[in-house]
């Protein structure tokens, strides 16, 4: 079960929280859910160069609170907060346009939008940023084994306890699509107290679409307790073992 279900959904209510935290009447729930999707789509498109890691949404009466976790918060804020104001105005227009199409929704201009930007301290330990980085390098036609090896080394230096990367598609322009993956450290998907960060991304190459999936194990968290950031990276293996190249497994025959 832990191998198939989404790692975040599997741990909701135990060590993970919902990305959208609000309650609504059953009649308005579909419209507000559609607004959340529109907000995430708009911010992801506008902040593509800011290293966007996560977006948290809270609603209080006629107020929307957004928490944006980004690796480069300066890009989000802009000089003197100009970029934040542009984002706020753009979101108001998007919600106003959506309100005219969705029955049961209130006008987008009636809500106050507050944006809080939080800097990601360990960008190399965020699965979303790692998957996006892998996809960008694949689009530049860099060999996937070299990309995976570099990403794993960066994640290990960031202090993660385990990382797994899976890439599927026409790798290196091969005629037959296949799936290859590698893992370093532990990825306990069945353990509910294990803090597993999961992300997936698509790389649009000249040979077609390549799918990228990343699992990052950041440590174990007891229910009801906050996870403390690890101050020091884990002890690295000996130098001779560190040079060992990661092994890949071909899953194309199993999936067929």
Swiss-Prot record:
Residues 246-256 have a biased composition (Basic and acidic residues). One of its GO terms (biological process) is translation. Residues 39-121 form the KH type-2 domain. InterPro entries: KH_dom (IPR004087), KH_dom-like_a/b (IPR015946), KH_dom_type_2 (IPR004044), KH_sf_prok-type (IPR009019), Ribosomal_S3_C_sf (IPR036419), Ribosomal_uS3_bac-typ (IPR005704), Ribosomal_uS3_C (IPR001351), Ribosomal_uS3_CS (IPR018280). GO terms for cellular component: cytosolic small ribosomal subunit. Binds the lower part of the 30S subunit head. Binds mRNA in the 70S ribosome, positioning it for translation. Part of the 30S ribosomal subunit. Forms a tight complex with proteins S10 and S14. This is Small ribosomal subunit protein uS3. It comes from Synechococcus sp. (strain JA-2-3B'a(2-13)). The gene is rpsC.
């Amino acid at each position: 079960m832990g191998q198939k279900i989404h790692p975040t959904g599997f741990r909701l209510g135990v060590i993970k929280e919902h990305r959208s935290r609000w309650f609504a009447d059953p009649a308005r729930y579909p419209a507000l859910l559609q607004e959340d999707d529109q907000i995430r789509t708009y911010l992801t498109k506008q902040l593509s160069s800011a290293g966007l890691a996560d977006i948290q949404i809270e609603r209080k009466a006629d107020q929307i609170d957004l928490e944006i976790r980004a690796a480069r918060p300066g890009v989000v804020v802009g000089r003197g907060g100009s970029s934040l104001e542009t984002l706020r105005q753009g979101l108001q227009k998007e919600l106003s346009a959506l309100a005219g199409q969705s029955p049961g929704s209130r006008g987008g201009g009636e809500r106050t939008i507050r944006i809080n930007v939080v800097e990601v301290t360990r960008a190399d330990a965020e699965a979303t940023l790692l998957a996006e980085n892998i996809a960008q390098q694949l689009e530049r036609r860099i060999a996937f084994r070299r990309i995976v090896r570099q990403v794993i080394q960066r994640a290990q230096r960031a202090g993660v306890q385990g990382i797994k990367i899976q890439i599927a598609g026409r790798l290196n322009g091969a005629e037959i699509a296949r799936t290859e993956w590698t893992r370093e450290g532990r990825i306990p998907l069945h353990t509910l107290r294990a803090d597993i960060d999961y992300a997936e991304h698509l790389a649009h190459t000249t040979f077609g679409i390549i799918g990228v999936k990343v699992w990052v194990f950041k440590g174990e968290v007891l229910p009801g307790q906050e996870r403390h950031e690890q101050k020091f990276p884990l002890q690295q293996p000996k130098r001779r073992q560190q040079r060992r190249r990661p092994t890949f497994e071909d899953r194309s025959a199993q999936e067929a």
